[in-house]
C-alpha cells in the first residue's frame, strides 16, 4: 500500500508560504501476522528559515494469539538558520492478554534533544525518556443474587525524565476501580498519585536563570456515579479533590495547589440514533492555579469557575458498531 501527499502554500505580503511533502508505504507480512511500514516527510518553512526531513520505520507483529509488539523508530534532519542537526527517537509497546480477564501493556519511549518533529503537526515532545506499564483486570461476578455484575480495575505506573536525567525522574501512578451493576449503572473511583519527587521541566524549560523547582508528591482523587444507561434519561454525578505543587513557609511564595470540583449532567436518549448531552454545571475551585504566560513565565491565581455545556450526537443511518 502506498500513499502520497504534497501541498504548497501561497506567499503572503509578510511571509513566504510553507511546502509539505509526505510518502507512506505499508506491507503485510505472513510471518507472525506482522506489518511493516515506512514514512518520510519533508517540510520547508522559509519564513523561519527552517527545513526538516523525517524518516520513520514502523512495525506491528503478533508473536502469538494473545500478544502483540508494535512501535516505530525514526530520525530527523533539521536545518534551521544555517545550523544542521540530526535527531533520533523510538517508541515500543508490548501487550499480552494473560487471561481472558487480565491484560498487560509495557512501553518504552525515547526521543533525544534534536528529535523535534512538530513541523507537520506531530505531538511536540523531545528530550524525553519514559518507561512504564499498564494493567487492566475485569472480573465478572457469577453470583446472580449480587447487584454487582462486574468489577473493573486498571493500574498504570510511569517514570519520565529528560534524556540526560537532569529533569523529571519522578514516578507517577494511576489507578481506576469501577463497579458495574446489573441495572447498567456504575460507580467508579480514580486516583493519580505522584509519589516520588522529581525536577520540574514545564516551568524551567532548561532556562539558565530559572530557579531550581522541585515537583513534590501529590494526589488527585475522583469519584463518579452514573445511573442506568439503559434508561432514556441517564444522570451522572462526579466530584474530585487534589493537592499538588510547592509549599513554603512564606505565604507569598506558597505554590501548593489545592483543588476540588463537583458536577452534574444528564444524557437524554429518546431513540437509538439521537442523544442529547447536557452538563448542567461543573464547579471548580483551585488555589495557586498555574497558567503559562510566555516562555519561562507563569502566573499563579486563585481560580473559581462554573461551567456548562451542551452537545448532540446524531447517528445518520441504521448501522452502528
Positions of predicted regions on the chain:
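Short, flexible loop/turn elements at secondary-structure junctions
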Residues: 6-8, 27-29, 40-44, 63, ...
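Short strand-coil-strand connectors
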Residues: 30-32, 62-64, 99, 182
Amino acid at each position: 500500500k502506498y500513499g502520497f501527499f504534497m501541498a504548497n502554500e501561497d506567499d503572503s505580503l509578510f511571509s513566504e508560504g510553507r511546502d509539505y511533502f509526505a510518502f507512506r508505504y505499508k506491507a503485510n507480512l505472513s510471518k507472525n501476522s506482522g506489518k511493516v511500514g515506512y514514512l518520510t516527510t519533508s517540510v520547508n518553512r522559509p519564513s523561519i528559515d527552517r527545513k526538516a526531513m523525517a524518516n520513520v520505520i514502523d512495525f506491528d507483529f503478533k508473536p502469538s494469539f494473545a500478544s502483540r509488539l508494535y512501535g516505530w523508530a525514526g530520525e530527523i534532519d533539521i536545518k534551521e538558520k544555517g545550523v544542521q542537526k540530526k535527531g533520533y527517537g523510538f517508541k515500543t509497546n508490548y501487550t499480552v492478554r494473560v487471561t481472558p480477564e487480565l491484560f498487560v501493556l509495557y512501553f518504552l519511549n525515547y526521543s533525544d534533544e534534536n528529535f523535534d518533529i512538530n513541523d507537520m503537526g506531530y505531538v511536540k515532545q523531545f528530550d524525553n525518556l519514559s518507561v512504564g506499564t499498564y494493567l487492566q483486570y475485569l472480573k465478572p461476578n457469577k453470583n446472580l443474587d449480587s447487584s454487582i455484575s462486574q468489577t473493573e480495575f486498571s493500574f498504570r505506573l510511569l517514570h519520565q525524565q529528560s534524556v540526560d536525567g537532569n529533569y523529571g525522574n519522578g514516578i507517577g501512578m494511576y489507578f481506576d476501580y469501577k463497579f458495574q451493576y446489573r441495572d447498567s449503572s456504575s460507580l467508579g473511583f480514580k486516583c493519580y498519585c505522584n509519589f516520588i519527587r522529581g525536577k520540574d521541566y514545564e516551568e524551567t524549560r532548561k532556562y539558565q536563570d530559572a530557579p531550581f523547582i522541585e515537583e513534590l508528591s501529590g494526589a488527585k482523587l475522583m469519584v463518579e456515579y452514573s445511573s442506568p444507561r439503559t434508561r432514556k434519561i441517564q444522570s451522572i454525578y462526579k466530584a474530585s479533590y487534589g493537592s499538588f505543587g510547592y509549599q513554603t513557609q512564606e505565604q507569598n511564595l506558597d505554590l501548593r495547589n489545592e483543588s476540588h470540583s463537583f458536577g452534574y449532567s444528564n444524557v437524554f436518549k429518546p431513540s437509538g440514533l439521537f442523544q442529547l448531552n447536557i452538563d448542567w454545571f461543573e464547579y471548580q475551585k483551585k488555589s495557586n492555579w498555574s497558567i503559562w504566560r510566555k516562555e519561562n513565565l507563569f502566573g499563579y491565581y486563585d481560580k473559581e469557575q462554573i461551567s456548562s455545556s451542551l452537545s448532540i450526537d446524531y447517528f445518520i443511518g441504521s448501522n452502528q458498531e
